[in-house]
């Protein structure tokens, strides 16, 4: 019996325009720091030119979190996966300004990257912060946090790895909690049915500030592989 096909939510809509500066940054930095992903297994040691703990951020948006963490942890490597060109250009421009070299960027669907590009146990930390909540009921199937996707994320985590998530949309937070708690190979660090306190180490980004301005609570989740 063949396995059921993977359910791939189309969790994004490509929008926004790159500024001239962002376009120039992409043209200048893509050869060194961009990854032309075509579906094959990635050689992370070759991409980064070293062996180090790897953090993968899914949908890094304008790159605030990715850049802050890369600057704070030069001993780690950071792989950002984003479909929007404006965010990619902003990250490259900021890398130039800050002198960062420990970031690589893939402009591709994150589900496919985790499915075919990342080997089992290759990721020390996976981050999914403030993904599109798709609040309308008819769009819930487009939410990125779905059982099949969670299994892919769990597979990529190292034995001592960690999956961190955050959202300011309470119904999506409850959905995340239910899906992740149901994954048998992951353990909720806060305990079943619970969220963790906001980690001080997580940089504050515009998405969090916007949520708080709207009066939304912030929900953080943290999962580790089952020992």
Curated annotation (Swiss-Prot):
Record protein name field: tRNA (guanine-N(7)-)-methyltransferase
A Pfam family it matches: Methyltransf_4
One of the record's GO cellular component terms: tRNA methyltransferase complex
Domain of life: Bacteria
Protein's UniProt keywords contain Protein biosynthesis: no
Family under the similarity heading: Belongs to the class I-like SAM-binding methyltransferase superfamily. TrmB family.
Gene, per the UniProt record: trmB
Function: Catalyzes the formation of N(7)-methylguanine at position 46 (m7G46) in tRNA.
Catalytic residues (positions): 132
Listed pathway(s): tRNA modification; N(7)-methylguanine-tRNA biosynthesis
InterPro entries for this protein: SAM-dependent_MTases_sf, tRNA_(Gua-N-7)_MeTrfase_Trmb, tRNA_methyltr_TrmB_bact
Binding, substrate: 136, 168, 205-208
GO MF annotation, one: tRNA (guanine(46)-N7)-methyltransferase activity
EC number, UniProt record: 2.1.1.33
